[in-house]
Amino acid sequence: MGARASRHRQSPDQSQSQSPSPHHKHHHHHQTTRAPKPKPKPQPPPPQQPRSQPPPPPRHQPQQAPQQAAAEDGVGRVLGRPMEDVRATYTFGRELGRGQFGVTYLATHKPTGRRYACKSIAARKLARPDDLDDVRREVHIMHHLTGHRNIVELRGAYEDRHSVNLVMELCEGGELFDRIIARGHYSERAAAALCREIVSVVHSCHSMGVMHRDLKPENFLFLNKREDSPLKATDFGLSVFFKPGEQFRDLVGSAYYVAPEVLKRLYGAEADIWSAGVILYILLSGVPPFWAENEDGIFDAVLQGHIDFSSEPWPSISSGAKDLVKRMLRQDPKERLTAAEILNHPWIREDGEAPDKPLDITVISRMKQFRAMNKLKKVALKVVAENLSEEEIVGLKEMFKSLDTDNSGTITLEELRAGLPKLGTKISESELRQLMEAADVDGNGSIDYVEFISATMHMNRLEKEDHIYKAFEYFDKDHSGFITVDELEEALTKYDMGDEATIKEIIAEVDTDHDGRINYQEFVAMMKNNSPEIVPNRRRMF
């Protein structure tokens, strides 16, 4: 199981009982890989906004009825104004990142040549009224929060028949952890400065009636590569407007960062403070405070709430830092500090008591291991799926054909929704969406045959020795019994993962005897290891 929470969103009184399994950003990534989004120069083009700056709308907005008719009249279903082609104003370049709901591209403003990031959400992924509300809410919230130094600025929102496009300032300074790792030296004072920027975002959101609900390191990017670059919060896809004291019930977020009251399905804005506290713990130690072999184990650890301050490097970390972490990670939300109180804590203040002595170098190496996802395992899973025999997958093949009602060679969300009950599979709407998002590896809104097989094959098939050996042979081109750096690069280039940094990450993660290559025993151990990752593995569908 992955360590990422569900990206399906509901308003609080619409929440239905779901399996408590946040699945995600992820990022990823990956999206939870997040798209870097650099800052425009002064005098940017006038933002393309709703005709008047909207106040926070009620979560239950009246539906535009009929939605389809609106689209046919040339009025966008999401933004509620005449459709406009973003490509008339911006030239799209390379892909910057990919998430469950959209792909982010480099976008150049034609009149000025200034560069932005454009998050493009395919209209086919907005099949239900809730989906439209979610994107509409994200646009409203980003406009509502505009102007804060540490929140990415939305420059314009465009909608045509094929997609909704959000043009934002481009952050080219990289992810939070990447900057720390690349710098190689790090202190409590540096951690305090970063935490101050993160909590400043939380304080601004809460004071303006917005709960973020998905705070994690991957959702913070540096604006540029300068040492004094501001840190920017970039993803408000799970955010909601709230009133003081209002409680929510839908399960959202990411497993490592999710608050205990979210798992209990009754929470308010204090859940953001918990998530920020988890980030601070990682900034100081390199690992999350709640850790287990799988997602359920992480949730159990979160609910138990035991925080380790005895292992390295905690004995050498200041009492002020530990005090702040403890007060942000109180089990009872009412006992947690507010964002304003955190910013006044003596350890975090700009002129505060956080020491400037370097933290142990192992903190950075542990952070790097925690951040790196096992890309080799993901490719190996696909290799196994492609090499299963016809006899082994005959049942899955028939299942695919029965779901693919239009014989297009792909399965859409609507086909899954209609077909699974006929196969005797009871599944909630939120689980259906989690399943679709997890299986749709290339993010195109549908599941192709190989994606379907990869997602549905049972783990006991995967663990068969001959399947693992076939996957190993795929990488071990010269049959030497080892996967070398060159062989990794050759195999992963096919999947656009063959860069030097990724190869080094994989070797560091899998090569347990440190000989610079991967032997068969190390490969088997990796394939059978279920330790959670930042971005989700594909969920088993049945």
From Swiss-Prot:
<feature type="binding site">
    <location>
        <position position="476"/>
    </location>
    <ligand>
        <name>Ca(2+) 3</name>
    </ligand>
</feature>
<dbReference type="GO" id="GO:0106310">
    <property type="term" value="F:protein serine kinase activity"/>
</dbReference>
<dbReference type="InterPro" id="IPR002048">
    <property type="entry name" value="EF_hand_dom"/>
</dbReference>
<feature type="binding site">
    <location>
        <position position="406"/>
    </location>
    <ligand>
        <name>Ca(2+) 1</name>
    </ligand>
</feature>
<keyword id="KW-0479">Metal-binding</keyword>
<feature type="binding site">
    <location>
        <position position="119"/>
    </location>
    <ligand>
        <name>ATP</name>
    </ligand>
</feature>
<feature type="binding site">
    <location>
        <position position="408"/>
    </location>
    <ligand>
        <name>Ca(2+) 1</name>
    </ligand>
</feature>
<feature type="binding site">
    <location>
        <position position="511"/>
    </location>
    <ligand>
        <name>Ca(2+) 4</name>
    </ligand>
</feature>
<keyword id="KW-0067">ATP-binding</keyword>
<feature type="binding site">
    <location>
        <position position="444"/>
    </location>
    <ligand>
        <name>Ca(2+) 2</name>
    </ligand>
</feature>
<feature type="binding site">
    <location>
        <position position="440"/>
    </location>
    <ligand>
        <name>Ca(2+) 2</name>
    </ligand>
</feature>
<feature type="binding site">
    <location>
        <position position="522"/>
    </location>
    <ligand>
        <name>Ca(2+) 4</name>
    </ligand>
</feature>
<dbReference type="GO" id="GO:0005524">
    <property type="term" value="F:ATP binding"/>
</dbReference>
<feature type="binding site">
    <location>
        <position position="513"/>
    </location>
    <ligand>
        <name>Ca(2+) 4</name>
    </ligand>
</feature>
<feature type="active site" description="Proton acceptor">
    <location>
        <position position="214"/>
    </location>
</feature>
<feature type="binding site">
    <location>
        <position position="451"/>
    </location>
    <ligand>
        <name>Ca(2+) 2</name>
    </ligand>
</feature>
<keyword id="KW-0106">Calcium</keyword>
<dbReference type="InterPro" id="IPR000719">
    <property type="entry name" value="Prot_kinase_dom"/>
</dbReference>
<feature type="compositionally biased region" description="Pro residues">
    <location>
        <begin position="41"/>
        <end position="60"/>
    </location>
</feature>
<dbReference type="InterPro" id="IPR017441">
    <property type="entry name" value="Protein_kinase_ATP_BS"/>
</dbReference>
<feature type="binding site">
    <location>
        <begin position="96"/>
        <end position="104"/>
    </location>
    <ligand>
        <name>ATP</name>
    </ligand>
</feature>
<feature type="binding site">
    <location>
        <position position="404"/>
    </location>
    <ligand>
        <name>Ca(2+) 1</name>
    </ligand>
</feature>
<feature type="domain" description="EF-hand 1">
    <location>
        <begin position="391"/>
        <end position="426"/>
    </location>
</feature>
<feature type="binding site">
    <location>
        <position position="487"/>
    </location>
    <ligand>
        <name>Ca(2+) 3</name>
    </ligand>
</feature>
<feature type="region of interest" description="Disordered">
    <location>
        <begin position="1"/>
        <end position="73"/>
    </location>
</feature>
<keyword id="KW-0418">Kinase</keyword>
<keyword id="KW-0723">Serine/threonine-protein kinase</keyword>
<dbReference type="InterPro" id="IPR018247">
    <property type="entry name" value="EF_Hand_1_Ca_BS"/>
</dbReference>
<dbReference type="GO" id="GO:0005516">
    <property type="term" value="F:calmodulin binding"/>
</dbReference>
<feature type="compositionally biased region" description="Low complexity">
    <location>
        <begin position="12"/>
        <end position="21"/>
    </location>
</feature>
<feature type="binding site">
    <location>
        <position position="415"/>
    </location>
    <ligand>
        <name>Ca(2+) 1</name>
    </ligand>
</feature>
<comment type="similarity">
    <text>Belongs to the protein kinase superfamily. Ser/Thr protein kinase family. CDPK subfamily.</text>
</comment>
<feature type="domain" description="EF-hand 3">
    <location>
        <begin position="463"/>
        <end position="497"/>
    </location>
</feature>
<keyword id="KW-0449">Lipoprotein</keyword>
<dbReference type="GO" id="GO:0009931">
    <property type="term" value="F:calcium-dependent protein serine/threonine kinase activity"/>
</dbReference>
<keyword id="KW-0677">Repeat</keyword>
<dbReference type="GO" id="GO:0016020">
    <property type="term" value="C:membrane"/>
</dbReference>
<keyword id="KW-0519">Myristate</keyword>
<feature type="domain" description="Protein kinase">
    <location>
        <begin position="90"/>
        <end position="348"/>
    </location>
</feature>
<feature type="binding site">
    <location>
        <position position="442"/>
    </location>
    <ligand>
        <name>Ca(2+) 2</name>
    </ligand>
</feature>
<dbReference type="Pfam" id="PF13499">
    <property type="entry name" value="EF-hand_7"/>
</dbReference>
<feature type="binding site">
    <location>
        <position position="480"/>
    </location>
    <ligand>
        <name>Ca(2+) 3</name>
    </ligand>
</feature>
